[in-house]
A protein has these predicted regions:
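Residue-level marker for buried hydrophobic side chains located in beta-strands
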Residues: 45, 72-74, 104-105, 177, ...
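Short N-terminal helix/helix-N-cap motif within the alpha/beta-hydrolase-1
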Residues: 54, 82-87, 114, 187-188, ...
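Acidic, His/Gly-enriched loop-helix segments that form or flank divalent-metal centers
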Residues: 132-238, 242-248, 258-268
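Divalent metal-coordination and catalytic microenvironments
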Residues: 48, 77, 107-108, 141, ...
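Active-site neighborhood of divalent metal-dependent phosphoester bond hydrolases
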Residues: 81-167
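Methionine residue identity
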Residues: 1-6
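N-terminal active-site segment of His-dependent metallophosphoesterases
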Residues: 15, 19-91
Length: 285
């Protein structure tokens, strides 16, 4: 079975069984309180990383983040599948601790990891109710976490546990909601939906709030789509460009620039859309 076919199968199974993974959310939503409500030059969102730490570090260098003028939100799914999930988590943690205007959300893979750890700890490879995490790329994360000193692994796990599942800010009176997967138009603020939802969100959301998401690779949303972020007409910005897929990228989207451009009222050109994005390619991509 090819990589894309295996991805589709795992994604399908993962979606069906997602509600087996219950995380007690300590923080449902974070707001732009650190920034004091001021206007940011750039409002940035980084899509799914999935253990591609080297690629993320190259992307970070391209972004040239400025804490005095920028806001940046990591959209979750730092772990699993790629070669360096623990180093990816550590990198994200360092940025949130170093910069007041960098925020990191929880993704569904982090939620699966926490459910597994809460059920079994890190010392054993259990194949049972929670083996879906291991089957969806969690084995390398479990192995690397288990290799850390106990105190270090516990601290990193606690960092993950404290991630909010959404973040809100605004730009020139337009509300912006950052979540990993999306929102359910029929059920407001359900944590599971914010981590897991796919089709119902993309087909059913028509709200006034701009919703910025990862989770679903843009290559999966449109069959002919290149690995680039999508700016959809129903106020959705899709940032996951399939970091671990054969043609994948890690993408950073400047949401503020996109909103400024679309206020002109004309249909954005491909060049204008591209000007809202920075990307890095995994070495094996």
């Amino acid at each position: 079975m090819g990589r894309m076919s295996m991805y589709a199968l795992c994604g399908f199974v993962c979606d069906i069984l997602s509600y087996h993974f219950h995380v007690f959310y300590d923080i449902i939503e974070a707001r732009d309180e650190k920034g004091g409500g001021r206007m940011f030059r750039r409002i940035l969102a980084v899509g799914d990383v999935h253990g591609e730490a080297d690629c993320l570090e190259r992307l970070w260098a391209k972004i040239a983040f400025d804490d005095a003028h920028d806001l940046l939100v990591f959209l979750g799914d730092y772990i699993d599948r790629g070669p360096a999930p623990v180093r990816t988590l550590q990198f994200v943690q360092r940025q949130t601790e170093k910069y007041r205007n960098v925020h990191a959300l929880m993704g569904n893979h982090e939620a699966m990891m926490l459910s597994y750890i809460d059920a079994y700890g890190m010392g054993h490879t259990i194949m049972g109710q929670f083996d879906l995490w291991l089957a969806n790329g969690g084995k390398i994360t479990r192995k690397q976490l288990a290799a850390l000193p106990t105190a270090e692994a516990k601290a990193l796990t606690e960092f993950v546990r404290q991630r909010p599942i959404s973040f809100r800010t605004s730009h020139e009176d337009e509300e912006i909601l950052f979540v990993h997967a999306g929102v359910n138009p029929a059920a407001e603020d359900r944590g599971e939906d914010m981590l897991w939802i796919r089709e119902e969100f993309f087909k059913g959301y028509y709200g006034d709030t701009v919703v910025v998401v990862g989770h679903t690779p843009t290559q999966r949303l449109r069959r002919d789509c290149a690995p680039v972020p999508l700016f959809l007409p129903n106020n959705i910005v899709a940032c996951d460009t399939g970091s671990y897929l054969p043609d994948g990228r890690i993408s950073c989207v400047d949401v503020a620039r996109y909103l400024r451009l679309r206020r002109s009222g004309h249909r954005l050109s491909s060049e204008e859309r591209a000007s809202c994005c920075v990307q890095a390619v995994p070495r094996n991509g």
